[in-house]
Amino acid sequence: VFKRVDSYTGDTKYIYHGNDGTSMPWNDTAQRNYLKSEVREAVTNTIIHVAKKFDVIRFDAAMTLAKKHYQRLWFPKPGTGGDIPSRTEHSMSQEEFDELFPVEFWREVVDKVKEAEPNTLLLAEAFWMMEGYFVRTLGMHRVYNSAFMNMIKNEDNAKYRQTIKNVLEFNPQILKRYVNFMNNPDEETAHAQFGEDDKYFGTCAMMVTLPGLPMFGHGQVEGYKEKYGMEYKKAYWDENPNPELVKRHEREIFPLLHKRYLFSEVDNFQFYDFITPDGHVDENVFAYSNRARGEKAIILYNNKFQETSGWIKNSALKANKTANDDHKEMVTSEIGEALDLKNDNNYFTIFRDHTNNLQYIRNNKQLHDQGMYVSLGAFKYHIFLDFREVEDRDNIYSELAAFLDGRGVPDIKEALQETRLQPVHQASRKIFNTELFNYLFKKKNLEYSADKKEKIINRIDTNYQKFLNEIQDFTSRNGNRKKVVNDVKSLLNSQLNINQLKKG
């Protein structure tokens, strides 16, 4: 508590500091008695007054005013002891508490602000796994999603995957209201929690590609190590930005922020299980897709220090409202459908991996029937973008897909050209080989018999004609192949004559 003295009347009171029951009280705060309706009304009016001046309002430690926690802290049930020892003598039954505090305070605030200043965005800091409650029940516009930071940091991957699934089954729109972050002024810096290597960037990539609002902490991009509290007026450490860290943000993260329109909505968001070759779900892999404005994206992140590989195919259950808003149906889709790809064996999909800028090709029918196969290193991620479909009219794309066998290339167009030139390359290798050059240019091979020489010349003749045939097929041009072959044979004979003269 702190001592308050009225300098005019001399009246003295001892007032509690704010407290969440987990550590020392907040000595820059005074705790109000929210059991009094006039207090709740006064605070609500103050919020509305602020809303007339600012479009966004953030409520610090908002969860401490939720009914169940306010009761736990300040008016505990008889026999429970309470989290603030001196409040035990102020215990109160549930009935008494509900009579004095009948409606959730934040529900009243949201409703009254909506009526008075409807364009105001209300953002709540709510921990203790109350994020969903603040959005679903209290109607808060945005809520800090501390579960993202804590669970990804601790690699509680199965729990966080289930958290996302639960939201999708209840109401997918809630995902849009989460503020995802990797640190805040009350926590250690992002780099103390996630490092500065692959785990940090994998988590950061998730943060900026999930629906909701990504939030960067002060100094996060620069790699500052000093923890900044809300009370800090200046930095106390002499730190400089980490240039390599900044460059990697510019290369991997910032381009994704320019595509928030692709990631922020939930109507086309789908979440997947990552199925390993032995048929098990790898709970350490976060896999999801989204699409908007004709663009599509697939994101995968392996939040574990181990390699993995597997398939993504069927999405998790997702609530879909019907024409009757009171009813919802649970739906799922396979990845080809989620990306709105043609289910046709004659179509192929080409896409680019943002992490390495390589391009890949997959058959549409295979994507629909089998899903997408992906390999991931420890703490590695893939973000597949720039999807486009092509029709395979003359089997050139099927040949390319078979040739690449899942591998990525810098440019599909160049790889396609290289694939089309494969017959020409193979024919040329049969001509320009080691045996020919040894025969023509190494003196020890001048002792070949006449029959041996004739066989080599005939082989060159045959292979050269095949080579010219392939060139003609590729260019669709006719030429005097017989003349070219005769010219080559003439050159070979000339070379042989020169060799014989040298020998002589």
Residue ranges and their predicted role:
Residues A297, L367-E399:
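C-terminal beta-strand-rich structural cap/linker in extracellular carbohydrate-active enzymes
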Residues V1-K259, E265, L341, I361, ...:
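Alpha-amylase-like alpha-glycosidases and glucanotransferases acting on alpha-linked glucans and related
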Residues Y160-N166, V266-R293, D353-D369:
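Flexible, glycine/threonine-enriched loop-and-boundary segments that flank and lead into catalytic domains
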Residues P277-A338, L385:
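Carbohydrate-binding surface patches
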Residues R251-I253, V331-L341, A401-T434:
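Active-site-adjacent segment of 2-oxoglutarate/Fe(II) JmjC oxygenases
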Residues D326-H368:
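Trp/Gly-enriched beta-strand surface patches
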Residues F387, I412-G504:
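Terminal accessory regions of large proteins
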Residues Y228, E307-N314, E391-D394:
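Cytochrome P450 core scaffold surrounding the K-helix E-X-X-R motif
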